[in-house]
Design a protein with these regions (language model features):
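Netrin-like (NTR/C345C) domain of secreted extracellular proteins
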Residues: 78-205
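Beta-strand/loop nucleic-acid-binding surfaces
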Residues: 59-86
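OB/S1-fold single-stranded nucleic-acid-binding modules
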Residues: 1-23, 183-203
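Extracellular/periplasmic catalytic domains that process cell-envelope and extracellular macromolecules
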Residues: 21, 38, 57-59, 87-91
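Short structured motifs
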Residues: 12-15, 31, 83
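Solvent-exposed loop/turn segments at secondary-structure junctions
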Residues: 34-37, 51-54, 70-74, 102-105
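Structural detector for short beta-strands of small beta-barrel domains
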Residues: 22-52
Length: 205
């Protein structure tokens, strides 16, 4: 059996719908500014757009200073050992994140997550539609857009995804990301991100 089969078996035994279920806090965050990458971490600001599960430590609409552990590998359970995808945090993008209880202190907040980018578009319009369409998926180096209708291999897609990981983990992530977002956010998760981006641009509710 593959390690993917092992994950599914573990989820079934534990009654887990998704890897996020053991966390207290789950939310959709909007990235307010560019994150500054340092060795093993990145710092910046995020606004909580939608609270999905929460202990109340961060309120919807609140912007917090964040230190993101870029090399973080969750330790809570074996299931998390295969979920070490690391998002490259980018300004004006939205992410589904799980995080530990926020403690009031002078240091930035720590997020425990492998993350799921919100949303992902494999078929996009031309550059003129970037400002009104959901957040685009593009090559992290050249910002070249994925071509509509073209079939890509996992290796080719990894060049266009803003994540770093092995292709096996990437393949598993592609299979589960939509289910995760729909489970916690709803079927309109892509619309949610597009509307939020429009509000930030125009200042209108």
């Amino acid at each position: 059996a593959s390690w993917q089969d092992g994950i599914k078996e573990y989820r079934t035994k534990k009654g887990l719908k998704h890897v996020y279920d053991e966390y207290v806090n789950v939310g959709v965050f909007y990235v307010s500014d560019d994150f500054i990458k340092t060795s093993g971490s990145a710092t910046g600001h995020m606004k909580l757009l939608k609270s999905i599960k929460s202990d109340g430590s961060v309120k919807e609409g609140e912007t917090i200073s964040v230190t993101y552990s870029c090399n973080y590998i969750p330790k809570k359970d074996n299931i998390y050992q295969t979920s070490n995808i690391t998002p490259m945090i980018r300004q004006n993008e939205c992410y589904l994140l799980v995080y530990d209880k926020i403690v009031n202190s002078d240091i930035s907040e720590k997020f425990e997550t492998h993350g799921a980018k919100l949303p992902i578009n494999y078929s996009t319009g031309n550059s003129a539609s970037w400002d009104i369409s959901p957040l685009r998926l593009s090559d992290s180096q050249t910002l070249k857009i994925i071509e509509k209708g073209k079939v890509y291999t996992i290796e080719e897609l990894s060049d266009y995804d803003l994540f770093t990981c092995g292709t096996g983990i990437l393949q598993e992530w592609y299979r589960t990301k939509d289910a995760i977002l729909r489970y916690y956010v709803g079927d309109n998760y892509a619309e949610l991100a597009a509307n939020w981006k429009r509000k930030e641009r125009t200042g209108n509710e």
